[in-house]
Regions:
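Glycine-/small-residue-enriched capping loops at alpha/beta junctions
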Residues: 1-145
Length: 145
């Protein structure tokens, strides 16, 4: 994933995804692989910032010298199953992109367990909708000020 070339790789995570083993390594396979590619920066940052995957939580790490410039963890809460959960993810991604002045953003889920193919399409649509809405709102507020 780190090979992707862009401004922010945003990873939607649940509280369950953030569980770690006795060695402070992620139990989630996606986060474990990403953390290994980043030399442990993800687990270190999540511990330092007390990031647990709660709704509304986010942390963005700058990555010099790799494909993507930043990796962001966006909290989804206990589980992400409703369109509203994924719309909130999109809104958080748009806010992080605005703060980082990013123009190229990729969004992935740390786990999609329990999501049917149809649910994955609904989730993708909701993320896009939330991102678009928040981007529009940010632009509107910027020009209103």
């Amino acid at each position: 994933m780190v090979e992707w070339k862009g401004d922010i790789l945003a990873v939607g995570v649940t509280e369950k995804d953030m569980a770690k083993d006795d060695n402070s390594k992620f139990q989630n396979s996606i986060l474990k692989k990403l953390d290994a590619q980043l030399g442990g920066l993800l687990s270190e940052a999540s511990s330092e910032e007390d990031f647990t995957g709660k709704p509304g939580q986010s942390t963005v790490i700058r990555l010099p010298g790799v494909g993507t410039k930043r990796v962001g963890l966006i909290g989804l809460g206990q589980s992400a199953s409703s369109a509203g959960d994924f719309r909130s993810l999109g809104e958080s991604v748009a806010a992080a992109a605005k703060a980082a002045q990013a123009s190229n953003v990729a969004v992935v889920l740390a786990s999609s367990d329990g999501l049917s193919d149809e649910s994955k399409l609904t989730a993708a649509s909701a993320v896009a909708s939330g991102t678009y809405f928040m981007s529009f709102l940010i632009l509107k507020l910027t020009y209103a000020v």
